[in-house]
Amino acid sequence: MPIGVPKVPFRSPGEEDASWVDVYNRLYRERLLFLGQAVDSEISNQLIGLMIYLSIEDDTKDLYLFINSPGGWVIPGVAIYDTMQFVRPDVHTICMGLAASMGSFILVGGEITKRLAFPHARVMIHQPASSFYEAQAGEFILEAEELLKLRETLTRVYVQRTGKPLWVVSEDMERDVFMSATEAQAYGIVDLVAVE
């Protein structure tokens, strides 16, 4: 059995025979996008490109972003969030499995009233972390200042999109806070929990 991305048949309008395309290309044609890994520059650029392309192709049809991510890099995650706010179609966000760290930030960035979690999904928020522990003192201070700015940005977005007070979000981001789907709904990160 071959290992890799599964292929599915797809027939373009006006064609008699179907051609085999990988499952993700087929789903993209239906405006279904997937973040199923840690956020990095590569997946961020792919999702941004798809959202912009699909928005240009038809700005009246909504986009659906399925999320199962342990988090990842802050700047590429913020770029995905900003693109979701920029494109004209509404972006539905659907948490399946885990939306942690940057994954939860992208989840909360979906169109308000169109953010959903599957019943057994988990959501986790926390403050951004630095990977530059071995930097010189001067570099570390600059890094810490940038980290504080990023933390403030993320906190403001969570406050705006959840309706929670600033002090609650700030306190919760001090540590890893895990939530069930219903707890994430009560917190305001998602609007709906899918029924079993």
UniProtKB/Swiss-Prot annotation:
GO terms, molecular function: ATP-dependent peptidase activity; ATPase binding; serine-type endopeptidase activity
Keywords assigned: Chloroplast, Hydrolase, Plastid, Protease, Serine protease
Gene Ontology annotations for the cellular component aspect, listed alphabetically: chloroplast stroma; endopeptidase Clp complex
Chain ranges passing through the membrane: none
PROSITE patterns for this protein: CLP_PROTEASE_HIS, CLP_PROTEASE_SER
Pfam families reported in the protein's UniProt record: CLP_protease (PF00574)
InterPro entries reported for this sequence: ClpP (IPR001907), ClpP/crotonase-like_dom_sf (IPR029045), ClpP/TepA (IPR023562), ClpP_His_AS (IPR033135), ClpP_Ser_AS (IPR018215)
EC number(s) given by UniProt: 3.4.21.92
Source superkingdom: Eukaryota
Coiled coil: none
CDD domains assigned: S14_ClpP_2
Active site positions, chain numbering: S101, H126
Catalytic activity: Hydrolysis of proteins to small peptides in the presence of ATP and magnesium. alpha-casein is the usual test substrate. In the absence of ATP, only oligopeptides shorter than five residues are hydrolyzed (such as succinyl-Leu-Tyr-|-NHMec, and Leu-Tyr-Leu-|-Tyr-Trp, in which cleavage of the -Tyr-|-Leu- and -Tyr-|-Trp bonds also occurs)
Main location: plastid
Gene Ontology BP terms: protein quality control for misfolded or incompletely synthesized proteins
Subcellular location, record wording: Plastid, Chloroplast stroma
Sequence similarity: Belongs to the peptidase S14 family.
Subunit structure, interactors included: Component of the chloroplastic Clp protease core complex.
General function of this protein: Cleaves peptides in various proteins in a process that requires ATP hydrolysis. Has a chymotrypsin-like activity. Plays a major role in the degradation of misfolded proteins.
Name of the protein described by the UniProt record: ATP-dependent Clp protease proteolytic subunit
Organism, as annotated: Coffea arabica
Top-level taxonomy: Eukaryota, Viridiplantae, Streptophyta, Embryophyta, Tracheophyta
Gene assigned in the entry: clpP
